[in-house]
A protein has these predicted regions:
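Charged/polar interaction segments and conserved charged motifs
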Residues: 57-60, 75
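Short, glycine/polar-rich helix-capping loops at beta-to-alpha or helix-loop-helix junctions
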Residues: 72-78
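Non-catalytic interface/targeting segments
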Residues: 1-50, 54, 61, 81-122
Length: 122
């Protein structure tokens, strides 16, 4: 299983990024293998529109099963849902990528069943 966590940096100790489409990085890990890969998303950080859809396409191309993020807009949510990628939301208590991954493994994050933002990550 591959999990992608929205991040401001490139490793498990990096701060999480609370916005899916405009996250600077996605830290990708297979919790069973303890491997880590980084997917840069800088092209979407300042995108005028379509950042969520483009980010979702990048995630889908990496065969991700689960996304952990603070917020996901409607277009990104629909794109992820269309390819059966589950989205889990973390709150303000989650500070690092490692915190998010641990909370998800322990069942402390809620699966998102609808967009959590109106768009543009807000």
């Amino acid at each position: 299983m591959k999990v992608a966590i929205t991040a401001s940096g490139e490793d498990l100790n990096s701060p999480v990024d609370r916005v899916f489409g405009r996250a600077r990085y996605f830290v990708i890990t297979d919790p069973e293998q303890t491997s880590v890969e980084v997917l840069e998303n800088s092209q979407n950080v300042n995108a005028a529109q379509g950042a969520g859809i483009q980010a979702a396409q990048q995630i889908a191309n990496k065969c991700i099963d689960v996304v952990l993020t603070g917020n996901v807009g409607p277009n990104a949510f629909r794109a992820l849902e269309a390819v059966s990628i589950k989205v889990y939301q973390f709150g303000s208590d989650i500070l690092t990528v490692r915190d998010a991954l641990t909370a998800w493994k322990e069942g402390r994050l809620q699966e998102v069943k609808a967009p959590t933002a109106k768009g543009h990550g807000f």
